């Protein structure tokens, strides 16, 4: 049985066996045992006088053991049930002298350095159970709403974002590779016969699938060779990317908002104990901060607030005017001033809008074309595109999406303006030649949603083994 089974279907007075890792061993009598199936540990009461002392000497924090005994109602405070131990088997010893995860509070930085062991702490086991629940809820939402799950390539020859910040994939010996007539590495000699990279997005391929299946989504790892060593960026992260045929920007925003709310609603119900623990953790953390830096709502209240309230929707021009006339901008508190229409909104601007001005999630739409990707549908004004971003408190941008440009001539013109090689996108242009339709989609960064759901502040703490500049340990 798992520890979770014991709490859900309590077989009082029955003999049971459970395996797990020792959290603590107090007074040579009380073992706190956890197997990862639930936040709660089960207390196991040892008969010290009648237990082999060699076994007792090996019951240390981190050791894996098998407990056999009778489940009883607890005689002490703090737990409803406990196991009266009849037999202990040591499955894996753990030397207390050099085990890094001691039963005390560790800094998050220390735990990042020991990412292979940090899941054994209460904080990280809760985070990763919530991550699992969110991932399940994502698939559940799309399945129930008629979407087809598709897989898009990890190795690709196209740059969906047009940013060029991609990891190259090659079998060539770079130090001895053949050069072409322009003194550039000749990738025609490479495995794929051309330059290839790890994907930055599955969007373009998902668009192709949507043109035959209707509504589709892809959910997988993406890679950005962006040299951003911040608490908000990863080089490898997970993206959820739905694409919808016969869908305009308004429909797209409706789906994105509903999707986020339904996923969070599922997690609130599925991960109650983990959220209660993380909520208490954040309340205690808040007490150490100045009053002005404390959260107005606790974690669980924030999640319920998002689920139960409409997101604000404003266009870019409205957002620009709010920011331009804001106190931080007038007093030059923004690192990036907002003075000219067309400026790309930074995280500080996004967070001001959601945390100070509206105090709720915000969807900004109709962005200037010059700061957005080539595939976004041009508006009639010729200056803005049918793009949208969803901004969350504490996070900034959590979703980016758009209505895609379905008109072949307009798309070709845009590709030319941005000096993108049209030959590389021949197949993408084909989608506009043969039965083109209005279509839209968006991308949600899984880790950013998990940040919001757990109250964590560093994106490296919500993925098992973070990949960041100069760091590919584990």
Language-model regions: role of each:
Residues 87, 318, 448:
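Ca2+-coordinating acidic residues in Ca2+-binding motifs
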Residues 193, 198, 211-221, 234-248, ...:
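TRNA-recognition modules of translation machinery and tRNA-sensing kinases, especially anticodon-binding
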Residues 131, 249-257:
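Short, charged, low-complexity patches
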Residues 128, 246-250, 309:
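Short, charged/polar micro-motifs that form catalytic or ligand-binding hotspots
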Residues 160-166, 171-186, 258-390, 417-437:
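Metal-assisted phosphate- and nucleotidyl-transfer catalytic regions
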Residues 2-245:
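Class II aminoacyl-tRNA synthetase-like tRNA-binding/catalytic domains
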């Amino acid at each position: 049985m798992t520890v979770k089974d014991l709490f859900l279907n309590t077989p009082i007075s029955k003999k049971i066996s459970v395996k797990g890792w020792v959290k603590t061993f107090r007074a040579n009598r009380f073992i706190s045992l956890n197997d990862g199936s639930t936040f709660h540990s089960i207390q196991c009461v040892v008969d010290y006088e009648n237990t082999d002392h060699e076994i007792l000497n090996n019951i240390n924090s981190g050791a894996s053991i098998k407990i056999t005994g009778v489940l009883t109602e607890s005689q002490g405070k703090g737990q409803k049930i406990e196991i009266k131990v009849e037999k202990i088997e040591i499955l894996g010893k753990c030397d207390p002298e050099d085990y890094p995860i001691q039963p005390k509070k560790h800094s998050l930085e220390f735990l990042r350095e020991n990412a292979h062991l940090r899941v054994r702490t209460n904080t990280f086991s809760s985070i990763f159970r919530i991550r699992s629940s969110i991932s399940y809820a994502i698939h559940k939402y799309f399945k129930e709403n008629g979407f087809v799950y598709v897989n898009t390539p990890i190795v690709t020859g196209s740059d969906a974002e047009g940013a060029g910040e991609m990891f190259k994939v090659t079998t060539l010996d770079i130090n001895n590779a053949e050069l072409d007539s322009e003194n550039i590495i000749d990738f025609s000699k490479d495995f794929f016969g051309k330059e290839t990279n790890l994907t930055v997005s599955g969007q373009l391929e998902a668009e192709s699938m949507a043109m035959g299946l209707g509504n589709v989504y892809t959910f997988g790892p993406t890679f950005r060779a962006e040299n951003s060593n911040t608490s908000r960026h990863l080089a490898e992260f997970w993206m959820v990317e739905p694409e919808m045929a016969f869908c305009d920007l308004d429909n797209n925003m409706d789906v994105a908002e509903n999707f986020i709310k339904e996923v969070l609603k599922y997690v609130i119900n599925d991960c109650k104990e983990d959220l209660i623990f993380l909520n208490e953790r954040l309340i205690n953390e808040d007490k150490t901060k100045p009053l002005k830096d404390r959260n107005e709502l606790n974690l669980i209240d924030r999640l319920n607030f998002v689920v139960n309230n409409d997101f604000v929707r404003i266009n870019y021009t409205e957002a620009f005017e709010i920011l331009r006339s804001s106190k931080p901008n007038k007093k030059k508190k923004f690192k990036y001033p907002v003075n000219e229409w067309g400026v790309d909104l930074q995280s500080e601007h996004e967070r001001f809008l959601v945390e100070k001005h509206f105090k709720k999630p915000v969807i900004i739409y109709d962005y200037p074309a010059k700061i957005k990707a080539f595939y976004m549908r041009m508006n009639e004004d010729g200056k803005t595109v049918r793009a949208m971003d969803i901004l969350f408190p504490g996070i900034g941008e959590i979703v980016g999406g758009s209505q895609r440009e379905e008109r072949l001539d307009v798309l070709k013109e845009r590709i030319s303006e941005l000096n993108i090689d049209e030959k590389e996108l021949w197949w993408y242009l084909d989608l506009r030649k043969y039965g083109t339709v209005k279509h839209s989609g968006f991308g949600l960064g899984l880790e950013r949603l998990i940040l919001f759901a757990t109250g964590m502040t560093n994106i490296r703490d919500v993925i098992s083994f973070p990949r960041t500049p100069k760091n590919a340990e584990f």
